[in-house]
A protein has these predicted regions:
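12-transmembrane solute porter fold
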Residues: 4-20, 25-27, 40, 196, ...
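Extracellular/periplasmic helix-loop-helix junction of adjacent transmembrane segments
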Residues: 28-56, 290, 295-296
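Interfacial helix-cap and linker-helix signal at transmembrane-aqueous boundaries
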Residues: 32-33, 64-65, 150-158, 212, ...
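MFS-fold secondary transporters
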Residues: 34, 84-89, 104, 178, ...
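Helix-breaking motifs and short loop linkers at transmembrane-helix boundaries and internal kinks
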Residues: 37, 69, 90-96, 158-159, ...
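Central cavity-lining transmembrane alpha-helices of secondary-active solute carriers
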Residues: 48-62, 112-116, 302-314
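Helix-loop-helix hairpins in multi-pass membrane proteins, especially solute transporters
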Residues: 63-196
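Hydrophobic transmembrane-helix bundles of small-molecule transporters
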Residues: 134, 156-268, 274, 281, ...
Length: 499
């Protein structure tokens, strides 16, 4: 095997745990809720802190790779990822797990741009580079697709920390391989890092998400929630002004003035919001309501994961044949149809219908993602292709984080409003049971059998009602977005084969 392909193999090995870690916790949510005694709000932070931190860190980490060389960045990111995985596996509380997940995101934000830079540096010939990038994309989509299944297998046989602990030996092996196989690159000391701007962006995102969660759950005083929101908005405003005035901005904000690029960003964020939010919702319903094990839940969700992970080539062919506008709008419409159908589906008695709709959802989301990439890269000037790609990466990560937050908030709000609590619960118990189905499960274990059974029946009924409302709401919003996308992409020319 040539040195080039050995380098690629080493790079892909370190990317595998990063890709899996993006989705591995989806089926672990119910287990974490019980094992750590985490509230519904803490559970959402455990899962979405990874994507939200990564969204703000991936751009400056790319600049750090240019400054110190991608090999050093790859090794440093792998070491941080391994240490954070060990900390996460041994976390005694929800707060320490949230902090460990944030550190995991920092390591992942180093690894992802380092792997891409490594491929660009290793393969000078375009055909070989495209093949290498295709393999990289396959590892990313495949890892994310099978992450919940891997998590289910581990949780079936080991304790919850195993979903993180498995990363440690993998990281040790890939560090040794990369240190030996990957060639060293010259450093570019003049490359700016913009680390302060990245930290401000992360703080702004977290403060805005925190204030939104607090406002919906009513956990903080209104004035304090408003103060946090204003602080986040002020930081975001400062960040945007800094980007507009900088000679070499971290994010080229002027690209957002292009209607087609803005449409592409909206499609990318929406596709990830719906896909990741749906997977989290499904994982909880399958385990809490339908009593499936984590592995069984992972198997049940396999159609949407496989379809979304491996439909890219088909979607690319459709864009070439039908046109960007048609595929983008069609993807949104099919996603809306899937959500509206799933909102009316009984997962316990209509499994084949659920799997069919989930497969359609996965394919339509993949089509929307491919269309978003095509829109962004086709509309961006050549000299700003890298900046446009960076914006797309941020849109993916923000979409994943916001999907968990938005679906989780709407689900929690609807569940709390619709649960009909049985008699025999104190005020504190009633408040706990109404906060989330995970809290209801924890509480039921300490109640008399009759009251516990009545509570779980009420909790399951409320969750199913909330699930239907969330999916129906997502379906309606996607219909509205499809109309907007059809209008905004009206100026995009059809390919010759479609004429």
């Amino acid at each position: 095997m040539s040195r080039q392909w050995m380098t690629l193999m080493a790079i892909l090995l370190v990317y595998i745990p990063v890709a899996i870690d993006a989705t591995v916790l989806h089926v672990a949510a119910p287990t974490l809720s019980v094992a750590l005694g985490s509230s519904g709000n803490e559970l959402l932070w455990i899962i979405d802190i990874y994507s939200l931190v990564m969204a703000g860190m991936v751009l400056p980490m790319g600049a750090l790779g240019d400054k110190i060389g991608f090999k050093r960045l790859l090794l440093l990111g792998s070491a941080i990822f391994g240490i954070a995985s060990l900390c996460a596996a041994l976390s005694p509380t929800a707060m320490t797990l949230i902090a460990s997940r944030a550190l995991l995101a920092v390591g992942a934000a180093m690894i992802v741009p380092a792997t891409l830079a490594g491929i660009r540096s290793t393969f000078a010939e375009a055909s070989q580079r495209n093949m290498a990038l295709g393999l990289w994309a396959a590892v990313g989509s495949g890892g994310a697709a099978f992450g919940p299944l891997v998590g289910g297998i581990l949780l079936e046989h080991f304790y919850w920390g195993s979903v993180f602990l498995i990363n440690v030996p993998i990281v040790l092996v890939v560090i040794a391989i990369n240190a030996k196989v990957v060639p060293r690159q010259p450093a570019r000391r003049e490359q700016p890092l913009n680390l302060l701007q990245a930290l401000v962006l992360i703080a702004a995102i977290l403060m805005l998400v925190f204030s939104a969660k607090s406002a919906l759950k009513g956990q903080l005083a209104l004035w304090l929630t408003a103060l946090v929101a204003l602080g986040g908005a002020a930081m975001l405003t400062w960040f945007i002004r800094k980007q507009l005035s900088a000679a070499r901005p971290m994010v080229d904000m002027r690209l957002f003035t292009h209607r087609i690029i803005l449409s592409g960003v909206m499609m990318a964020m929406t596709a990830l919001i719906t896909l990741v939010g749906f997977e989290l919702l499904m994982a909880q319903e399958l385990q809490f309501v339908h009593q499936k094990t984590p592995f069984e839940a992972g198997i049940f969700m396999l159609p949407v994961m496989v379809a979304s992970g491996f439909s890219g080539p088909i979607a690319g062919l459709l864009v070439s044949r039908l046109g960007l506008r048609e595929v983008a709008t069609g993807g949104m419409l099919l996603s809306a149809f899937s959500f509206l159908g799933l909102a009316l589906t009984d997962f316990s008695t209509q499994q084949w219908l659920a799997w069919g709709l989930m497969t359609l959802l996965g394919f339509s989301v993949a089509s929307a993602l491919l269309a978003s990439s095509s829109a962004i890269m086709a509309a961006a000037p050549k000299e700003k292709a890298a900046a446009a790609g960076a914006i797309e990466t941020m849109a993916y990560e923000l979409g994943a984080g916001l999907g968990i937050a938005l679906f989780g908030l709407i689900l929690t709000r609807s569940y709390s409003a619709s649960i009909a609590l049985p008699s025999g619960l104190s005020g504190a118990m009633a408040q706990q049971a109404a906060s989330s189905i995970g809290e209801a499960v924890s509480l039921s274990q300490a109640l008399p059998a009759g009251v516990a059974q009545a509570l779980m029946t009420a909790a399951k009924t409320a969750f199913i009602q909330a699930h239907s409302l969330v999916l129906a709401t997502a379906g309606v919003l996607l219909l509205l977005l499809a109309a907007g996308i059809w209008r905004s992409l009206a100026t995009v020319a059809k390919p010759q084969s479609a004429l």
